[in-house]
Amino acid sequence: MQCLLRALGATPALVLAMSASAQTADKASLYPAAAAGDGATTGGYNLSRWAEDWRALCDPAKRTDPIDALKCVKLTPSGDVYVTFSGEARLRVNHTTNPNLRDSPAQRQDIVRLVGGADVHVGEHLRVYAEVAHGGISGRELGAPAATLRNDIAVQQLFVEAKGRVGAVDVGARYGRQEFVDGPNLMVSQRDNNTIRYTVNGLRAWARTETMRVDAFDLKPTQYGDLGTEDDVIDPARRFSGVTLGFVVPKGWFGGAKLYVDPFFWRRRNKVGAWGGRVGPATRYYLGTHVFGEAGRVTIDWTVNHQWGTFRDQKIDAWHLLFAQNVRLGTSAAAPRLGFHADYASGGGGYGDGKLRNAYAPFGNNIYYSYGLFLTPSNLITVAPTFSVSPTPRLRLSAAVQRAWRANVHDAVYRASGAPFAGTQNVRDARIGDVLQLQAIWTLSPRLSVTGRYEHLAAGPSLTRAGYTSSDFLAGWISFRF
């Protein structure tokens, strides 16, 4: 294992630290898994497949079909060394009218995602996870598809992890290429909407007790090519590092509520930052808090953070205020939910000489605002009532009507890539537009699901006066996971 760590580029000190931390541990993790920063696990499955725990299926008596056997393939007679195989096949069709919000022929994307992973466990304390992916795309009016949509084969993840227990503290470290989702979804996400997911390279380490945690990381993004594995490299221009804390709110404070508070301090460096047609080095710091969880029938996800630093010769002074909440209209878990989200992302200075007040998410989940990728939390104010219901245990319907404005009319409207809609910085009307969102998810089984999505973006004056127009987005996809 130490040889493998060195092959992946770990320093000798890291090798020794990870090996030492693996000497004492317990099967059960101390900190609640739902808030440990690895994403949500539902029905045994997680978007990040390494976050799944299939140890129970090492007992053949608990398997219900042949696929279950792939979750624990023993490599030693004792079963201390075993491998968990995982995979996904997703077929998807996107239809977008007026792509890029220009009056132009509709775009159709026929997309294929194939993913295969192997999680090798060496006892309770060491593991190696490897995952490869293929992205295929065809259709019409495609332009030049990004490497996250078209890629013959990519090493999507490859890391080694060691974990253990020191007294009453779980400690661990993960080194290599990995998905990172430890933070608010609108700020950090593996971006499942892509065919090839967003991954980063480097070190993440943690220490956790039953009621608090600390996670530290130093990561660089993967820069994908569109051919084979050899052109998927570590991006030399960008670096993301920081510390996130986590605290479990005592249940007695709010009548048994499951609430968590995560303060964070991050730094993002980019040698080729771009605002207002200017390119230059940028260093941005984030200091904020993420509060989330359930209190009775109410679910909340709130984030406040201040951003500062420099872009070229400009000082950065920006804010994110992100609030999502809903209430369950009944006692059962399947009862309808009614809620709203209200978000503020400051703007201004992208085309000026004063302070740069445009908020910026490191690599957030932009489909939250628009599957057409027409909006991002920079110079943006949104308010959206939301509703979801499950008329049957396997069908989930949801709807939202989102109204959007610019926070600063002297700056542009920005799309998901962070690029501006050219010319919008010269329009002095705040209204961006409205987005109607409808979605249906039919879960035939934990492994198989079918999703349909429709959106209509009704362009407002900020867009139409700069020559942009409205758009419809319609998509359907089927996903099989094992």
Regions found by a protein language model. Give the residues of each.
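Extracellular/periplasmic loop regions
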Residues: 36-54, 60-64, 277, 303, ...
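Signature for the C-terminal beta-barrel architecture of outer-membrane proteins
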Residues: 166-171, 187-352, 410, 423-427, ...
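Outer-membrane beta-barrel pore domains and translocons
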Residues: 88-92, 133-135, 176-180, 219-221, ...
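Predominantly the C-terminal beta-signal and adjacent terminal strand-loop region
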Residues: 444-477, 481
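N-terminal periplasmic/intermembrane-space "pro-region" immediately following the signal or transit peptide
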Residues: 2-5, 14, 20-106, 123, ...
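Surface-exposed loop and membrane-interface regions of Gram-negative outer-membrane beta-barrel proteins
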Residues: 58, 95-112, 121-168, 186-189, ...
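Residues on the lipid-exposed face of transmembrane beta-strands in outer-membrane beta-barrel proteins
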Residues: 87, 114-120, 157-162, 203-207, ...
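Membrane-embedded beta-strand positions of outer-membrane beta-barrel proteins
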Residues: 85-87, 130, 173-175, 205, ...
